[in-house]
Amino acid sequence: MATDACIAAIRAAAPTRQFTPDELVSITEEVQRQVREQMALGKTPRAAKATVATAMQAEAKAAAARAKWSAYNDILKMADREAENRPAYAMLSDTGGGTTRNYATSVENSHKALLGDLLYRQQAELKAAKVDKRVLSRDPVWENKLAAELDRREDPTRGPSTGDKSAEDAARILGKTLDASRAMQNRQGAFIGKVEGYMPQAWDMWKARGDGSEAAYAKWKEIFGKNRDKDFAGLLPQQIEAKLRGQWQAIKSGVFGSIGDAGGHYDLGARVSQSRTINFNTAADWVAANRAYGIGGIADAVSAHADRAARNTAVMEMFGNKPKQLFDALREKKMNAAHALNTEAGNKIGDALKASRNSSLFGDVTGIHDIPGDHRISTINANVRALSQMIHLGSILAGGQALIHIPLNAMAHRLTGGSFLEGMATQLRGVFGKDQDMAHAVHAGSDALLQSTIRRFHSDDGSVGQRMAGFVNSFYKATGFSGFMDNQKGALGVALTHYLGRAAGKTFDQLDPRWQTSLTRYGIEAPEWDVARAFAQKASDGRMHVIPADIADAGVARKFQNYVTGHVAQGANEPTAWARNVVVGGTRAGTPAGEIARYLTQFKSFAVTMMQRQFGSLLRGGVDVPGIMLLASSAMGMGFIGGQLHGLLTNQHQNMPTDAEGWVKLLTDSAVRGGVFGLLGDAMLRDGMRSGSDVAKQLVGPVGEPLVDLIGALNNVRQGPGEGSRTTRGQEAIEGVHKVLGDITPNFWATSAVYNYLFPYMVANTLHPGAVQRHQEVMRKNNQSWYIPPSP
């Protein structure tokens, strides 16, 4: 069948469809491949073409039906979004306060809730089957068996049984996650069919890219170009080569299996429905490829697959099958409507919608900005910043800085049916991590499960290598911070569902007004409340609960799960996509501007988030004066306690002030440590980073701190000791080296305590006479004393 004739036939079959040249070539090649396949089975050319034509006609009808449904769905989505009284960009990520005070539904929150639905259920089933530790061990020998069972889970004829029940159970559970991921996307407009022997497609773009050369492609092709009979059946050699090169390009660019180019007006439902599967002949072939170019073990691949599915679903749920097109159209309509008001407020809204940052935020939320400009630059710098986390945050728990999360979570209780004091008591008990099974039932309390610990301290970084990410997460486990945060989030999540169950006998209008506002922001009003409260029952902790997963109405269940997920994120002060976007100015990783922004603003997303989430909630519907006083006073109190714990590590404590100046200094220091002014990120850093004399360090960010100290030391050595000074150039150099080493040494709580109690002053005084006395004078001015004075 001539190519021109085939193209003409395609156009005749779909006269209203405007095909791109690439689509026409792709369809033509597929038709020709299928004809050759039929001929290889013994059919005449005419019979082969007739068979393929019949199949293509059926597929065309199905595609037309899908397109019609998609168009109708997009119309409904646009109507829904137009009816909402908030700017288009606010639907991407809850911006807290201002024009979005009555809404909290967002792509970002839905993404997180959907991912929780998949992974918490999976974790519970793996644990019940007693294979959770086996799966997470990533043992190569056992994973071979797991892959084989995953490959044959629906068709036992695909290979022999391994005879390993644990592998069979794990494959069944992980397979359910893959099936659920496909189903949730199909419900929103995708049409993803089952693929025989489907294995998760989670390829590492950095490994595939290598140095981007032909040699890197040849190395990749050595594995992916063989043992794929089904993928290559009926294709000519040049077509196989074109397919392989296209897949390599898609994988190394990060587009393969992803949401795609968020800058284009593509049909997302159709895009995720397209075949983006690399089928190997056997599970062993897939395992070999995954070990060479995958993101980790099988559990990692399944989690990455679930994450993409959750994000795709959240985007389509909010913006339909053509999300960027609908978003742009909606933004333009709302912008014009705002300007048409001819008021100052309207003009501000219109200008905000017009800002290019909104397109950047769309890229952040949909994931396209996870793909950096230059992967090598991005990866190197992201790993440096990850190392900076360990240098600066090793004592985040023992040093008391993490305690601020207790009152922040307690404030969330106050908005959701509890009281602040009840919240403080709950969160203090939660430090010890009780009711973790209940926490998982309500999808709360496992940063490690959702692999989100490392992202808490990044402006955006998704470029951290797998090995470094694992190392940093292990580091936070060692510090106790991961466990502390999981326990805090779990305690809040369980309390939220308990408050729902406790109030099940009340009607919606009988609830506290603040609580009604919190529920309404997630689309929960009297009808949804009446549906949900009918499912109140005693849970394993002996108290009444309304657990979202138990609610029979799927739509209502989703709203309540979003409500729980959103408030847990608020209590944890997790940076939103909006906050991260603001902090880095909408720049992209791997670009000069993007990397500079990320270095200068590392940890600063906490400051923005504090103002957005915490104070934003207190300005919603009017100024909540009692709430502001509670938040400020409790944060200051935790800042004071944190300062005392920090003193234990640094071998110096704060004396009680004896004058007004001392009290002002103590209260100010406690307020800054507690993040009262939204400076939570700075409060996590060392004292020097908060002092007014170290403005240069504040400007360059924590990674630049050693450079500032090094420059200062070199300058001191160059200038030499001042007049009347007893120091020498050599001693100035030693002091400078000591300072720089302190900047780059991880302040893990145990080593920090040993260092501060046993080492520095004795050595410093030997090398630099008078160092202890001078430091003691500084401490006296700051009203501080040593716990254990150093030897003179």
Regions found by a protein language model. Give the residues of each.
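Short low-complexity linker/loop segments enriched in small residues
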Residues: 614-732
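Hydrophobic, well-ordered secondary-structure elements that form the walls
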Residues: 603, 707, 737
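Low-complexity, small/polar and acidic-rich linker and loop segments
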Residues: 2-180, 184, 191-209
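Hydrophobic alpha-helical segments
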Residues: 719-792
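Short linear interaction motifs
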Residues: 159-162, 240, 247-259, 268-286, ...
